[in-house]
Amino acid sequence: MSTALVILAAGKGTRMKSDLPKVLHPIAHAPMLVHAMRAGAVLEPARTVIVAGHGAEAVRAAALDEDEGATVVLQEEQLGTAHAVDQARAALEGFEGDVVVLYGDTPFLQPDTLERMLAARKTHDLVILGFEAADPARYGRLVMQGDSLERIVEFKEATEQERAIRFCNSGLLACNAETLFALIAAVGNNNASGEYYLTDVVEIARKQGLAVTAVACDEAQTLGVNSRADLAAADAIFQTRARAELLDLGVTLMAPETVYLAADTVIGRDTVIEPNVVFGPGVTVESGATIRAFSHLEGCHVSRGAVVGPYARLRPGAELAENARIGNFVEIKNAEIGEGAKVNHLTYIGDASIGAGSNIGAGTITCNYDGVMKHRTTIGANVFIGSNTMLVAPVTLGDGAMTATGTVVTRDVEPDALAKARVKQENKPDRARKLFEMLRAKKASKQKET
């Protein structure tokens, strides 16, 4: 049977104290909404419906960027969770499969949990996701009778015996689409806040004689984010899990707690990551590479055996071939570095390609921007670039070419040619002594005046 996702993402998130919609706050460089969508994607949903409210256009853009087939609907007034789900009714018209309701600010659901919810749906009309709370506090309690969920009891209405229950409601559920919307139609708002609560569908389903159950997961999967402190805690949880996964995959993290990973970071086995490395979004590192300390990588690809850093920056579009070397205080942007090529010190390479085996001397700059447009620099194979060379793009250096130290290259250099363009040196005898005497006299004169 096919499955649809309904992800609730309409909340303003007042406690976040932000103009950004709560579900768009990032964990490991990816919006919480995207984490929820990726969690649900394991079910291979036939339809995905995002219910947006506050900041709807920004939410729509983020959702469609992740899944262009998603449908985004608007909850103009926030009248409760049941009302939010009901906004998906039109988008799911004619859909005969199961609906799984997720929350856009609950980013840690695991694939097996969702799969177990759908497995339970085969024998029950309505499935609620619960968790064993370390501190149940004011969560709603799930009162079970065998594998049957009898009712959800809110804390303020629970007896002392019911408050002792540690099995709590997460708010997530799975149900046949037709059944779910029929249950929601029966939900009222006769409560202090005048809202329509999704949890009420359990009582309605029981009264209709439907089979209701609850599936358990660990509490961390249901962690919701409502404040900046919650966001920081959630990010820390993600980082701990992601680091552990890399270690299990055969990646060496020399100081795991200092390495920051993005949600989509991919690192191959036998790669060594030194302390204080930051991975932005869109990074792939192949097996056997080394990322040295204090490097920052984003939107780049590092091939097998390459070495990056220390103190290197790889920006979007950086492509390092096998055994390439990028050293300290080097920045690479939108550039391909060929096999075995070396860019070892104090260099900026932007909008460029460097052929295999080439060596780029310290202080080399690709002058790629004319104030309006970017231009490319093309460096062939086995080229030697002398220290402090300025490469004024657009410019091409052929295979085997060389530049003299301090050269400003403004024209193409033929293969195997030497480019030399610098002012001829003159040594003026005794000029330095006279200049220092003049400058010291000026300094002494100013000091007397003050």
From Swiss-Prot:
Ranges for region Pyrophosphorylase: 1-228
Keywords from the named record: Acyltransferase, Cell shape, Cell wall biogenesis/degradation, Cytoplasm, Magnesium, Metal-binding, Multifunctional enzyme, Nucleotidyltransferase, Peptidoglycan synthesis, Repeat, Transferase
UniProt: UDP-N-acetyl-alpha-D-glucosamine binding residues: 8-11, 22, 75, 80-81, 103-105, 140, 154, 169, 226, 315, 333, 348, 359
Subcellular location, record wording: Cytoplasm
Binding site for acetyl-CoA: 362, 368-369, 387, 405, 422
Chain intervals for the UniProt region annotation (Linker): 229-249
Keyword Signal among record annotations: no
GO terms under cellular component: cytoplasm; membrane
Active site: residue positions: 345 (proton acceptor)
Biological process annotations from GO: cell morphogenesis; cell wall organization; lipid A biosynthetic process; peptidoglycan biosynthetic process; regulation of cell shape; UDP-N-acetylglucosamine biosynthetic process
EC number, UniProt record: 2.7.7.23, 2.3.1.157
Family stated for the protein in its record: In the N-terminal section; belongs to the N-acetylglucosamine-1-phosphate uridyltransferase family. In the C-terminal section; belongs to the transferase hexapeptide repeat family.
Protein name in UniProt: Bifunctional protein GlmU
Organism: Ruegeria pomeroyi (strain ATCC 700808 / DSM 15171 / DSS-3)
Gene for this chain: glmU
